[in-house]
Amino acid sequence: MGVDLSDKAIKSAKQLSKETSSNTTFICCDIYDLPRYLDQRFDIVFTSYGTIGWLPDLNKWAEIISRFLKPNGQFVFVEFHPVVWMFDDNFEKIDYRYFNSGAIIESESGTYADKNADITQEYVMWNHGLSEVVNNIVKNGLEINSLNEYDYSPYDCFNKTKEFEPRKYRIEHLDDKIPMVYSIVAKKKNNS
């Protein structure tokens, strides 16, 4: 089962599923609306890069995760570190607060998948500190098994990056001085 707000992402996922002969279902919807489209529980819920920055309400997000996990089910989460989102695009100065203080409205050329794409768009994002993420997960009946931070990104998706090992990127002038990614593994409590 895969869920995404982007119809293009769903189309791409369906194509990959077809190419790999995977029997997978996909739902295109706002994650907050998922209970309207799905009534099933899972052993694992996995959420990856670039997801929560689009969401204003992490309590609602964590409620959704908990709702769709079976008791003792595992939540696996990997995301760009909130420290990364504090910087300007070139990582030269701090432009934003670490903590969520409301919507950030920006205009950007290119896309996160193709920095050179001939497109300019306005978007709305939210910064979420680690305590906001962890506390909402715990508040919604999950127990944190691990929280890890990494000083690199597996993707070359930021300005001024350098690959220091295969598929490991850092901001060139910051080297290993900032966290770039974090991961959380949590388990839904048996009684929630």
Report residues per predicted region:
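Acceptor-substrate binding/catalytic loop of class I
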Residues: 82-90, 117-132
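Residues lining the SAM
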Residues: 47-49, 78
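Conserved class I S-adenosyl-L-methionine
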Residues: 74-111
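A short acidic, Gly/Pro-enriched loop at the edge of an enzyme's catalytic core
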Residues: 36-45
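Short alpha-helix
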Residues: 123-147
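A short glycine-rich, Lys/Arg-flanked "PGG" loop and its adjoining helix->strand segment in the class I
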Residues: 59-74
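Core SAM-dependent methyltransferase catalytic element
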Residues: 140-142, 167-192
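Class I SAM-dependent methyltransferase SAM/SAH-binding core
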Residues: 1-34
